[in-house]
Regions:
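A short, exposed loop/beta-hairpin motif centered on an aromatic-Gly-Thr core
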Residues: 26-39
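Short aromatic-glycine-(Arg/Gly/Cys) micro-motifs in beta-strand/loop hairpins
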Residues: 5-28
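Short, mixed-charge low-complexity intrinsically disordered segments
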Residues: 2-4, 46-69
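Intrinsically disordered, low-complexity regions enriched in serine, threonine, proline
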Residues: 11, 24, 38, 59-60
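A general, composition-driven signal for non-globular sequence regions
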Residues: 1, 15, 20, 35, ...
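A general secondary-structure boundary signal
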Residues: 19-22, 37, 65-68
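Basic/aromatic-rich interaction segments and small domains that mediate binding to polyanionic partners
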Residues: 13-17, 39-46
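Compositionally biased, low-structure terminal segments
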Residues: 7, 21, 33, 48-51
């Protein structure tokens, strides 16, 4: 199987926090570096089994601000 790979410059990635609720209604979060909120959602679904099985459990995807050091 031949996969096409895209090279995305690291400078274009931004930190996103994906908030979701589990079956006990506890609010949890995962953080990802992504180009946009949609990609952050896809990454969350790929790396978090609960979100993969319950994609509608996501209730917020927020882009975090980085202050220049």
């Amino acid at each position: 199987m031949n996969q096409t790979q895209f090279k995305i410059p690291l400078s274009s990635l931004r930190p996103y926090t994906v908030h979701y609720r589990n079956c006990d209604n506890q609010r949890l979060e995962n953080c990802f570096y992504a180009c946009d909120a949609y990609e952050a959602r896809l990454l969350a679904m790929e790396f978090n089994r609960y979100i993969q099985e319950h994609p509608n459990s996501i209730d917020l995807i927020r882009r975090e601000l980085i202050k220049n050091i």
